[in-house]
Amino acid sequence: MLGEINPDKSMEKKEYKTELKRLENELGSLQLRLRSVGLPVVIVFEGWGASGKGTHISRLVNPLDPRYFDVRTTGKLNEEKQMRPFLWSYWTYLPPKGQIVIMDKSWHRLILPGIREHWGLSNMEIHGFYYDVNAFERQLYDAGYLIIKLFLHISKDEQASRFKALAKEATTAWRLNERDLKQNEDYEHNLRQFEKLLRLTSTEENPWHVIEANDKRYASVKIMKTISERIKERLKEIENPKPPVKIQASATVLEKTLSKVHPDETISDEEYRLQLGFYQERMKMLGNKMFAKRRSAVIVYEGWDAAGKGGNIKRLTSEVDPRCYAVVPIGPPRPQEHSRHYLWRFMVKMPKDGHLTIFDRSWYGRVLVERIENLTPPHIWQRAYREINEMEQHLVTHGVVILKFWLHIDKDEQLRRFEDRKKDPSKAHKITEEDWRNREKWDEYEEAVDELLFRTHTSHAPWIIVESNHKKYARIKVLQTVTDALDDAMR
């Protein structure tokens, strides 16, 4: 791919000025149009060292309204990024609808030549990274993002010349490092590695665009042309939408899981007191051990309304150092959340190494309430099962322990708790009209829960059904399950 492309293409100054002015006007107009239709755009620059990424980004943003674009410097893996799954920072950079984000380096950084050797990545880890980045890009495309990936290609001699020029000036010499020089020294080897990366991460929906960048004038014009053409293509698709592709229903007969669970398990008061103290002390010790070993965990609470999630979370965390955990309650998305990919608001809350995050409701709302209440079209919530599994796999690959609890009560117990809340002034705020409406759709929710258990229960991110008619039993079961899993993970 790269070996067949001559990076020496050039452009005369007069032609450059004419084209630059035309393209600047066009990009300014396109920015207004993409804002009006709510098209989020991610422009990714990648390429050889000294290929001119900074220069070309500066020229690109010149005609744009600075209120509606953001430039992100993404290259260096600082401590914060190293303590998160490697795609975490790129999730945090995603623009809202109608805005542009420009990244000076791509999410492919860890698998670039030189960098992967620096981190000592195995072939299996590299294979996992390819899978993760392709899944990430597909998820964004499916959600309506336009991703424009630009690879700036220069020759070995041109790179050596630019390195020499940088080294001469005190104001730019700091930008050079041993890895840059090694890249030029091993140019042919790195060329083959870059070709492999482009081949394995270029898809019909999210292709790479190679920019011949020996001549900066030619490169700037091609970059602007490419971006302009891609935006116009996507705007045309938005203005003339195709009907959504229907996802074929699986022929597999889904198992009726919840109906087989009897939520009446109990524990005596004396046994509860003994086990509560034991497991809370164990949880405290494991929380400290997690911090020392830099292991993180995500615990998801889902369940029927009034199943006891809040009290369960309180008992789980009561002895844990509050600096090491966070509880994230999830409600309807706020405007800034609704304007991004639906997983964005969850990814930005994922714990850094050594910490625990507990989600009181979660990303599974997409295949529960959004499905039942017709808040999301079927073709969108149906693809969420795959997206959720991919996200959880990415977290686990980083070393995150994931446990997902469904707190299960029967319909009679829910009614009793609803009535108790209605009668008790101190609990009346816990019961809403929405709770009663959800109760009327019990059978629909049960069917949706059975499907999510079937499609998203994995060995690395398992679902645990917690019999919760008796709250004390449920609290001990969760404490025991969590402490056992954390203990196993840190052996």
Roles of regions detected by a PLM:
Residues 1-491:
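Glycine-rich phosphate-binding loop of ATP-dependent small-molecule kinases
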